[in-house]
Amino acid sequence: MDGGLCFDSWSDYLGLSSLISRGLQPQREGERPRWDVLSPASAEPLPSNESVGHKGCGFCRSNREALSLYTSHRLRALDGRVLCPVLRGYTCPLCGANGDWAHTMRYCPLRRLLRDPQSNSNNPKLRH
């Protein structure tokens, strides 16, 4: 990778490169990229980076997105809603969550229930 500016298509398991490419608008020299297509659900102002220890979106950073993308937004709002435009577009295959409450399979609340059926025998929601 060239300093985080390239996307490795071999690990693009969510199809992020095409989503990001659509969101990039031509920019003038010195301007930050515009992510109009990928705007977060809320237009609420973000706290300053220093006040919350903000280093960018952890989801995009973990997926080795470009620095300009992962520093342009936060993963979640203070109330827990997902702000990351990339993650908001993902639908969990286990529970169908997306948008404000989107998550990957790794963080799906159903994952623990599905892995340990013995502890779920008293859970009426999981009975057939």
Swiss-Prot record:
Ovary and testis. Keywords: Cytoplasm, Metal-binding, Repressor, RNA-binding, Translation regulation, Zinc, Zinc-finger. The keyword RNA-binding applies. One of its GO terms (molecular function) is translation repressor activity. Residues 25-52 are annotated as: Disordered. A motif (C2HC 1) lies at residues 57-84. Pfam families: zf-nanos. Interacts with ccnb1. This is Nanos homolog 1. It comes from Xenopus laevis.
